[in-house]
Swiss-Prot record:
One of its GO terms (molecular function) is zinc ion binding. Its EC number is 6.3.4.20. Belongs to the QueC family. Catalyzes the ATP-dependent conversion of 7-carboxy-7-deazaguanine (CDG) to 7-cyano-7-deazaguanine (preQ(0)). This is 7-cyano-7-deazaguanine synthase. Coiled coil: none annotated. The gene is queC. ATP binds at residues 14-24. Homodimer. It comes from Staphylococcus aureus (strain bovine RF122 / ET3-1).
Amino acid sequence: MESVLNNEKAIVVFSGGQDSTTCLFYAKKHFKEVELVTFNYGQRHDTEIEVAKQIAQDQGMKHHVLDMSLLSQLTPNALTQHDMEITNNEDGIPNTFVPARNLLFLSFAGALAYQIGAKHIITGVCETDFSGYPDCRDSFIKSMNVTLSLAMDKDCVIHTPLMWLNKAETWKLSDELEVLDYIRTKTLTCYNGIIGDGCGECPACHLRQRGLNQYLESKGAL
C-alpha cells in the first residue's frame, strides 16, 4: 500500500495547528508530492494564517490560502467572533462549532485537488477527543468521500490518520515521525492565539497539554 501511495499526490487541509501539522508530516512520509490548503474564514486570530504560512515555508511546500470569510456571515460563533466567550450550548456542542464548516472545506479541497491532479485529501479530524462537532465523525467523512467522488466523477480518497487516536496517541505519532518538538513549539492550537504551549487556560490548550503529559508519562519522559 505504502509503495503505491508514494507515487501519488495529496493535499492536506492545513490550519497550522497540532493535528493538521501532524497530518502534513504524515503525508510527506506517505505521498510523493504534497500541497497544503488553508481556509481564511475570519478566525479569532489572524495569527493562525501566518503560522500556517510559516510552516509551509519552513517545509518548502506549495501552499494555497482560500478566502472563506463568508462563513462568519452565516452564523455567529466563538471561532470568528472575537468578543464571544467560548461555552457549550444546551445541546452540548461548543459554540466554536461552525455548521457545515468541514463540509465546505472538504468540498473546496476536493475542487482544488481535482485541479492540481491530486487523488488524496488528508484532514486531521478525529472522533476520539471529539468535541461534539458532528462534521468530525467518521460516518460524515465516509459519506463525504462518496459525495466528492460522485460530484467530480473521479476517484477521491479522504484520509483521516488521526480519526481513532486520542491526543496522547497523536503526540506519539508525531514522535514516531520525529517532529514532536517541532509541533510542540511551532504550531498554534490555542484559542487565544498563543503559539506553542499556548495560554494554558482555554479548552484547546487543556486538551493538548493533557495529551502531551499522558504521552510523556507513558514513555517515562515526564
